[in-house]
């Protein structure tokens, strides 16, 4: 495949093996939302209770990198929506989760105009003040690029800028090192991973299902969609039940992110 293909990704996957466990959420509200990525606060409480009852221990992304324990699990959120400032504190207090939020820094304090769903309903991103507050109560922050564009479609100069600018902005806001990132639209390739490593990232995440052969610079995650129950998430984590169906559904959902890519191209964005 050409490195210009935004959906190109290097395969580090050995099918159906044990792996480091990472969940990825996006929106966390009770409101009606376009798309499949909204999950209500009540339902995430039920899920976190189920994970705890099944012996899972919540750890940070950095702690997971050094773990060799299939019962440790990291909680991540892509896009950094503003409602997380209200939704996360009670979850941190009750379940002692150590979440990481991946933020497209060009949109701090702005609406999600990068997303095709914003045509129907726009959503605000975290403000600088909200990021500062969440960082103070133990939330980690990572990069989701600067402008939420497909990184593999960029030339080397633009790629380096996306990686470094977002990192620098978050470090300036939080006063803490930023060493992790989530690839916009969930895809990467060897050139992007090399650039991420050069920029100082120690871990980076895709939207592919995880596997124990994943590179630290292309780690898969288990996505949680609005229709998921604790049982279906357990199937995804344990590679049981309808796991092949869930894996195929994840691939299809990731492919649908082409809508965002096409909108940005139509609007003349990089």
Describe the predicted segments one by one.
Residues 111-122, 148-156:
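Surface-exposed cleft-lining segments at the edges of enzyme active sites
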Residues 97, 103, 149, 160, ...:
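Conserved SAM-binding loop
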Residues 1-75, 82-85, 153-180, 186-270:
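C-terminal active-site subregion of NodB/CE4 polysaccharide deacetylases
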Residues 5-11, 85-87, 116-136:
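Alpha-helical scaffolding within the catalytic cores
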Residues 16, 52-53, 90-97, 124-143, ...:
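Acidic (Asp/Glu)-rich catalytic clusters
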Residues 81-82, 147:
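Short, glycine/acidic-enriched loop or turn micro-motifs at the edges of active sites
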Residues 96-118:
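A short, conserved beta-to-alpha structural element at the edge of catalytic cores
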Residues 23-29, 140-148:
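Histidine-centered catalytic micro-motifs
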């Amino acid at each position: 495949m050409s490195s210009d293909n935004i959906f190109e990704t290097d395969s580090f996957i050995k099918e159906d093996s044990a792996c480091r466990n990472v969940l990825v959420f996006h929106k966390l509200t009770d409101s009606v939302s376009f798309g499949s990525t909204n999950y209500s606060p009540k339902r995430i409480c039920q899920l976190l209770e189920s994970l705890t009852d099944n012996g899972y221990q919540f750890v940070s992304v950095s702690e997971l990198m050094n773990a060799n324990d299939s019962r440790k699990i990291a909680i991540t959120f892509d896009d950094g929506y503003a409602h997380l400032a209200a939704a996360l504190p009670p979850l941190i207090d009750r379940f002692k989760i150590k979440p990481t939020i991946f933020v497209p820094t060009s949109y701090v304090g702005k609406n999600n105009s990068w997303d095709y769903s914003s045509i129907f309903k726009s959503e605000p991103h975290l403000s600088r003040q909200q990021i500062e507050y969440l960082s103070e109560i133990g939330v980690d922050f990572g990069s989701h690029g600067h402008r939420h564009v497909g990184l593999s479609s960029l030339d080397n100069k633009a790629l380096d800028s996306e990686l470094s600018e977002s990192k620098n902005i978050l470090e300036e806001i939080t006063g803490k090192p930023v060493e992790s990132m989530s690839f916009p639209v969930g895809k990467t390739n060897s050139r992007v991973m090399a650039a991420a490593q050069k920029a100082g990232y120690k871990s980076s995440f895709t939207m592919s299902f995880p596997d124990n052969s994943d590179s630290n610079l292309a780690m898969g995650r288990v996505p949680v969609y609005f229709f998921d129950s604790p049982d279906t998430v357990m199937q995804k984590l344990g590679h049981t039940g309808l796991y092949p169906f869930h894996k195929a559904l994840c691939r299809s959902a990731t492919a649908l992110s082409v809508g965002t890519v096409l909108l940005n191209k139509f609007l003349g964005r990089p």
